[in-house]
Amino acid sequence: MDFNLSEEQLMIQQAARDFAQNELLPGVIERDRDQKFPTEQVKKMGEMGLLGMMVDPKYGGAGMDSVSYVLAMEEIAKIDASAAVVMSVNNSLVCAGLEKFASEEQKVKYLTPLASGQVIGAFALSEPEAGSDATSQKTTAEDKGDYYLLNGIKNWITNGGTASYYIVIAQTDPEKKHKGINAFIVERGWEGFEIGPKEDKLGIRGSDTHSLIFNNVKIPKGNRIGEDGFGFNFAMAVLNGGRIGIASQALGIASGAYELALKYAKTRKAFKTEIINHQAIAFKLADMATQITAARMLCFKAATEKDAGKDISESGAMAKLYASQVAMDTTIEAVQIHGGYGYVKEYHVERLMRDAKITQIYEGTSEIQKIVISRSIAK
Ligand code: CAA
């Protein structure tokens, strides 16, 4: 693995950093308070190529590598973890899945507007009774000849209320277990497709999380992704890459909290000196810096392996497992270093602490990552 970033990668990192400072930081506290989706900012992210970063330019993407994606995600998440998850889902779950597995016709129709940021997408796998146990899908898509008839409920869908296109995983033949699952592209506005109320969340409150209700929705045959029965393998393959996105989001949350804590520790005085001169504080910062660097290396490793076409189930899971733990630990300590100030909203660290928790839950809980890693190393 080459640790020297190229000129182009450094430029992308700087562009994302500038964008986050200038466009995401203003209003981030209010968007968190009001659960307000960053509509204008996401539009600009699309114009900058941040919503289809790794997609071939012939399908509207920016044609960049996955390390650039990690760098940009970290910068965006440092300032606004909600905008970062919108970016992660659109890039890694929706665009990457379509680019790799969709038909040419589907790519032209759906991938191009999604990768160029004209619209955003969502990925609907989780259900009220099927989160970690993803093969237990209750949503059904019955083969009716010319079309499939979709019925069921999806839960906790990121971009659920703002997406135009949804990748929906559903059971087509329960007898066949995971080989009887398919993935479909469903358009917002189709008859029988209803979007449930917005979830009132602990963190990433600027992102838009809804349940989706399908009541006899007709899906044209041409909107199935891949061969019949490919849906579960599709979801697993897509989630492997998605975990790099969430690991990078977690990395950004951690490094954002660390930078704020370091700055504070260098200026805040207690017992006649800046608090960084107290070993109790300095050692916390030393641990944070070490863990963040290790998390970044795991993200780079998984991203480099992805671009080399290697199996990233293990490296993606390791990056997500570790970076999300670092996000949680670092943000808790950042609040602690800030003392009473850390507990109020204007210092940002309490928001980052709330935002961190979800990175241990979505796109596979930490426990699921350990299943993936342990099965891989046992092979
Ligand atoms: N990569 C590629 N393929 C995989 C895989 C992986 N990481 N894990 C499993 N598979 C494949 C297996 O090879 C097998 O395929 P074949 O039969 O063709 O060989 C098939 O999937 C079934 O595998 P298992 O028998 O191992 O399946 P299982 O029932 O034991 O479950 C699991 C495996 C890893 C636990 C899986 O269910 C899982 O990953 N669960 C977590 C789901 C998840 O991440 N949900 C998050 C929701 S999406 C979200 O959060 C989005 C958002 O909005 C932010």
Can you say where each PLM-predicted feature lies in the sequence?
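Short Gly/Pro-enriched turn/cap motifs at secondary-structure boundaries
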Residues: L114, E129-S132, W156-N159, D173-E175, ...
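Long, acidic (Asp/Glu-rich), low-complexity accessory segments flanking structured domains
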Residues: N216-N233
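A short, Trp-centered hydrophobic/proline-enriched beta-strand micro-motif
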Residues: G117-L125, I169
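Short Ser/Thr-interspersed hydrophobic loop/turn segments at strand-loop and sheet-helix junctions
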Residues: G49, M73-A77, A170, V186-E191, ...
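Alpha-helical interface subdomain recognition
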Residues: M1-V89, F101-Q106, P113, G117-Q118, ...
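A short core secondary-structure module
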Residues: Y147, N151-I195
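Helix-loop "lid/cap" segments that line or gate small-molecule binding pockets
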Residues: S92-K100
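Flexible, small-/acidic-enriched active-site or ligand-binding loops
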Residues: S136, E191-P220
